[in-house]
Amino acid sequence: MENKNTENISLESKLYTAEEVATILGVSKTTAYREIKRLNAELEAQGYITITGKISKRFFNERAYF
């Protein structure tokens, strides 16, 4: 059985936080939360489970223009 801390580290390394998204896009944290919410809605429509305030790095990098 895996250690819960190891599982969290693995999951966290696959997600961006709103603060990280704000830095990447050069926007405020509020705007980053808004964009994460919009992107998470797309993922939910495709049947994925999402975490509020976080976004998959892979999905974000595919969708972001930078």
Regions found by a protein language model. Name each.
Residues 7-8, 47:
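Short, functionally important structural connectors and interaction interfaces within domains
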Residues 1-5:
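Short, Lys/Arg-enriched anionic-surface-contact patches
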Residues 25-65:
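Major-groove DNA-recognition helix of helix-turn-helix-type DNA-binding domains
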Residues 9-31:
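Polyanion-binding surface elements
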